[in-house]
Amino acid sequence: MKALIYARVSTNKEQQETSLKRQEEELTAIAAENGMEVVKVISEKASGYEMDRDGVFELLDEIKNADIDVILVQDETRLGRGNAKIALLHCIYREGVKVYTTAHRGELELSEADSMVLEIVSIVEEYQRKIHNMKIRRGMKRAVKNGFKPQKNLKNQHGNSGKEKIEVPISEIVRLRANKLTFAEIAATLRGFGYDVSKATVHRRFQEYIENEETAE
């Protein structure tokens, strides 16, 4: 298994520096005991109540983009405290990554309360995903009902021109907006027809169109 070591202390005091090194040494030993290959070590000095930590974002990038099987930490509070801990554990488990701790000399054993909260978060996320998909379908139906014809309006507009700017059918954005669709619904509709666009992109393109029209006048 490929492992990532994460060590954290909350202050810059000299004794905390020693604690960081001790955490790394203990976690390296656990990796060796379990036949793990340590591919990354992340150490930082920051409050566990904060999510805006460089080390946390580096950890999330690694588990999403690299072949990481397990996170090694001294104990679960090193990942974070309070809601920050729950949020980070949810992100880690969602990627199918395990958490091993020095305290357990193996895989993290969550408290009953933390397990229940994580289960609730997963259920809520699943329903959010279902609602998002329903919004896409509703947006597509509403667009078609208001005269949007994808086989005609989006014909030959998927060609990759190599431009960095995302190509979107601005005429359809304007028309769908005129039919009272929100920017979120327009983005969902276009994604349903194969365009990888966000609400922000749709809004930006619409604003550019309005500004160009005003300039032309």
Swiss-Prot record:
Which is one GO molecular function term here?
Answer: DNA strand exchange activity
Question: Which InterPro entries does this UniProt record tie to the protein?
Answer: Resolv_N, Resolvase-like_N_sf, SSR_resolvase
List the Pfam families hit by this protein, alphabetically: Resolvase (PF00239)
Q: What induces it?
A: Repressed by LexA.
Which SUPFAM superfamilies did the record assign? Resolvase-like
GO terms for biological process, alphabetical: DNA recombination
Query: Which positions fall inside the Resolvase/invertase-type recombinase catalytic domain?
Result: 2-147
- The superkingdom of the source organism is Bacteria
Question: Active-site positions, per UniProt?
Answer: 10
Q: Which family does it belong to?
A: Belongs to the site-specific recombinase resolvase family.
| Protein name, per record | Resolvase homolog YneB
Per the UniProt record, the source organism is: Bacillus subtilis (strain 168)
Q: Could you tell me the gene encoding this protein?
A: yneB
